[in-house]
A protein has these predicted regions:
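C-terminal soluble domains/tails of integral membrane proteins
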Residues: 21-178
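Hydrophobic membrane-insertion alpha-helices, especially the h-region
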Residues: 2-12
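Transmembrane-cytosolic junction motif
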Residues: 10-23
């Protein structure tokens, strides 16, 4: 009797709501409602998601407003290099970046030895530093200088033109997520 009760409780309070959120995310993805995809899967830890959920969430973050440092054309190039068979680490990277977990994204980029992805993560971190109102001016300046040095080194290595003044990259021919 206790086992049956436990199974019912598990299904009712965990499995059914989880399946509902996954179904809602899939439906939103088909409708190209990327914000709703993100909202449906926001409570899921990366380790709890299947490959399909990771794929749709990663592409939703790229398409959505979460990754704002890219132009529409850059996003199209990035998306053209990602497919369902891509390395799951790529999906995890974009999910972390979309969730503003830049340190985790940087770590994944380093693990995959992907300088392009590392550069994107650095740019996202730079944006976070600039938007941080709680950081002292001295600390903000120091962190920005350190990060800008890393960004410029990677941009040079990747032959990407980078303008510090407006934090834009011209990545049209250099976007790579192999």
């Amino acid at each position: 009797m206790v086992v049956l009760f436990s199974a019912v409780v598990y299904g009712y309070f965990w499995r059914i709501p989880r399946q509902y959120k996954i179904t809602a995310a899939n439906d939103a993805y088909l409708q190209k409602d990327y914000i709703r995809v993100i909202d449906s899967l926001k409570d899921f830890e990366i380790g709890q998601m299947e490959r399909a959920q990771k794929y749709i969430l990663a592409t939703a973050y790229i398409q959505g407003e979460s990754v704002d440092s890219f132009s529409t054309k850059d996003k199209e190039v990035i998306l053209s290099k990602i497919n369902y068979q891509s390395n799951e680490g790529i999906f995890d990277y974009w999910i972390h970046l979309g969730r503003m977990e830049v340190k985790e994204a940087e770590n994944l980029a380093l693990q995959m030895s992907d300088d392009q992805l590392l550069l994107y993560a650095y740019l996202q971190e730079l944006s976070q530093i600039e938007d941080n109102q709680e950081m002292s001016g001295e600390e903000k300046s120091s962190k920005k200088q350190d990060l800008m040095k890393k960004v410029e080194e990677l941009a040079d290595k990747l032959h990407i033109s980078y303008r510090e003044t407006d934090a834009e990259m011209n990545t049209e021919t250099n976007v790579g997520v192999d």
